[in-house]
Amino acid sequence: MQEYAEGNELFQRVFFKKHEAELIKLAKEGQSPKALFIGCSDSRVIPDLMVQTKPGDLFVMRNVGNFVPRYKPDEDFHATATAIEYAVSVLKVSEIIICGHTHCGACKALYEEISDPSLIHTRKWLSLGEEAKQNAIRALGSGADKEALLRLTEQFSILSQINNLLTYPYVNKLVKEEKLFIHGWYYDIETGHIRYYDPDQKEFIPLSDVARSCRIPDADTL
């Protein structure tokens, strides 16, 4: 706890003091983020630092594997769906970023047997990555180099989650109206570089090379 206490003191002295005016404004007027960022819970993925956003810019939803379950019209407890619903319908974000990353533990676990009976939620959750795994195996073959297979699975997973996101009626509607834009990002934790999925080239290209595009990847162009 000592390191956290010292970190908070440093935060107050440096970051908070530097951004005090905008933070107080956000507290008084409320948030109006530009984008919903759906990322992995992995501790090596740090959204605000990765793209140097300001406080209030990103509404962040993180889970294991940056997975998006398909839309289910029920009133059960759905953390990811709730974040999407709130960001799109209440906060009116204009962009959704689904950010996967290299060396993803969730994608690696897709190729491992989960025998621990206590991991019932983990086993079920990982099924959301099965489509990406099968696509990678079809593309490279089951005997392919393991690291190459994992990297491709991570990238295919981003595309799978975009397709799942488009099953949400209110998301699909706004995308078709060009009022909401979806982006697939692939973060390299070893270099800090981000690659962006270009639906025209059907590949991930450096984010630094991408001008903001109005062409949104959907189920037909992926």
Q: How should these model regions be labeled?
A:
Residues 1-33, 66-94, 105-222:
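Divalent-metal-activated hydrolytic enzyme cores
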Residues 28-47:
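N-terminal low-complexity or amphipathic/hydrophobic leaders
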Residues 30, 43, 51-54, 77-80, ...:
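Generic structural signal for well-ordered secondary structure
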Residues 38-40, 62, 99-101, 183-188:
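Short beta-strand segments
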Residues 44-67:
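Catalytic core of membrane glycerolipid acyltransferases/transacylases, capturing the structured
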